[in-house]
């Protein structure tokens, strides 16, 4: 993180989220996890996707900072680009695909947390394997 990003004490963080997201090379990296929410940055390579999914008990807000793509939200497809934001309520089927020539970069807030605290996966395959084997479970209580 650059000089604008710092820790302020007991799990209190300050960062310029768009810069952190742009600098992230990983498919998915957890930046911060609290009791009720989690901040994650993602970089989707050209032709890649997050993957069709439903979070039964977790709301998700995604903000796109670079690239272009498509959002599939409950059976409807919409174009997305830098500056767009999507709010996905718990129980909604969704997927986000990179349809451009550059990485699709975003940050997302989950409430409650969806992934293991401090998890980082360089590729979608690594992230999927961690989920399949139970190594990407969110903290409890």
Q: What are these language model-derived features?
A:
Residues 1-36, 121-141:
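A short, N-terminal "cap"/entry segment at the start of jelly-roll beta-barrel domains
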Residues 43-45, 54-71, 109:
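Short, conserved beta-strand element in jelly-roll/cupin
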Residues 35-37, 45-49, 68-70, 77, ...:
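Short, charged/polar surface micro-motifs in flexible loops or helix N-caps
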Residues 22-26, 40-55:
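Conserved short histidine dyad/triad with adjacent acidic residue
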Residues 61, 87, 102-117:
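A short hydrophobic beta-strand segment most commonly corresponding to one strand
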Residues 52, 71-72, 88, 94-100:
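Short beta-strand His + acidic residue motifs that chelate non-heme Fe in jelly-roll/DSBH
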Residues 37, 46, 57, 76, ...:
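A generic "binding-loop/recognition-motif" signal
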Residues 76-90:
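Short acidic-glycine-tyrosine-enriched beta hairpin
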């Amino acid at each position: 993180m650059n000089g604008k990003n710092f820790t302020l004490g007991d799990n209190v963080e300050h960062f310029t989220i768009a810069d952190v997201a742009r600098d992230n090379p990983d498919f998915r990296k957890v930046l911060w996890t609290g009791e009720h929410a989690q901040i994650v940055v993602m970089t989707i390579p050209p032709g890649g996707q997050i993957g069709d999914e439903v979070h039964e008990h977790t709301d998700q807000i995604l903000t796109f900072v670079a690239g272009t793509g498509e959002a599939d939200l409950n059976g409807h497809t919409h174009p997305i680009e830098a500056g767009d934001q999507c709010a996905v309520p718990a129980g909604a089927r969704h997927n986000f695909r990179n349809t451009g020539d550059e990485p699709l970069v975003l940050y997302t807030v989950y409430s409650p947390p969806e992934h293991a605290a401090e998890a980082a996966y360089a590729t979608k395959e690594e992230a999927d394997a961690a989920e399949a084997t139970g190594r990407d479970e969110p903290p409890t209580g």
